[in-house]
Amino acid sequence: MEQSELGFIEKVVSLNRVAKVVKGGRRFSFSALVVVGDGKGSVGFGLGKAQEVPEALRKATEQARKAMMKIPLIEGTLPYEILGEFGAGSVMLKPASRGTGIIAGGAVRAIMEAAGVTDVLAKAIGTNNPHNVLRATMAGLSALRSAQLVSNIRGKLLEAPRK
């Protein structure tokens, strides 16, 4: 986990060397997938490509900062269970009780840590490709709605939860 000068948490999800085959041989370049979050419910991801690793990371980080979105959190976890889908992959995200921790792997864990989620259960289904898992997770998180937003949309008053 890397803390940037602006207070953002930056995580490199994948860094790949890719090759383009040309007449004279192979041309290598680098592809970087980065997740950026503030640890308080905002998270974004970016994909950067360049001839050198640092430049690919810089591009990905810049794109991730521009694509940041806010997700509703309740005491360090998600408000309700949700399924995010992208391509062949889907990611199931479940809220967890306090003290559970982040039970997720790879790209999902990176997103949750950067967003400031402390307790969550997650399972990636259908693909292990970090790009698709990342996009499926972000699709699920972007579909989350806070209780306040739902009550505003429905034009109803938000009541205190019954115990």
UniProtKB/Swiss-Prot annotation:
Q: Name one Pfam family in it.
A: Ribosomal_S5
Tell me a GO biological process for this protein.
translation
* InterPro entries named in the record: Ribosomal_Su5_D2-typ_SF, Ribosomal_uS5, Ribosomal_uS5_bac-type, Ribosomal_uS5_C, Ribosomal_uS5_N, Ribosomal_uS5_N_CS, Ribsml_uS5_D2-typ_fold_subgr
Annotated S-S bridges: none
- A GO CC term assigned to this protein in UniProt: small ribosomal subunit
Boundaries of every S5 DRBM domain copy: 8-71
Alphabetical list of PROSITE patterns matching this protein: RIBOSOMAL_S5, S5_DSRBD
Is the rRNA-binding keyword given for this protein? yes
Q: Does the keyword Electron transport apply?
A: no
Any one GO MF term held by the record is: structural constituent of ribosome
Keyword terms of this UniProt record = Ribonucleoprotein, Ribosomal protein, RNA-binding, rRNA-binding
What protein family is recorded? Answer: Belongs to the universal ribosomal protein uS5 family.
Q: What is known of its domains?
A: The N-terminal domain interacts with the head of the 30S subunit; the C-terminal domain interacts with the body and contacts protein S4. The interaction surface between S4 and S5 is involved in control of translational fidelity.
How it assembles, according to the record, is:
Part of the 30S ribosomal subunit. Contacts proteins S4 and S8.
Task performed by this protein: With S4 and S12 plays an important role in translational accuracy.
NCBIfam families attached to this UniProt entry: rpsE_bact
Q: What is the name of the protein in this document?
A: Small ribosomal subunit protein uS5
What is the organism lineage in this UniProt record? Answer: Bacteria, Pseudomonadati, Thermodesulfobacteriota, Desulfovibrionia, Desulfovibrionales
Which gene name does the record give? Answer: rpsE
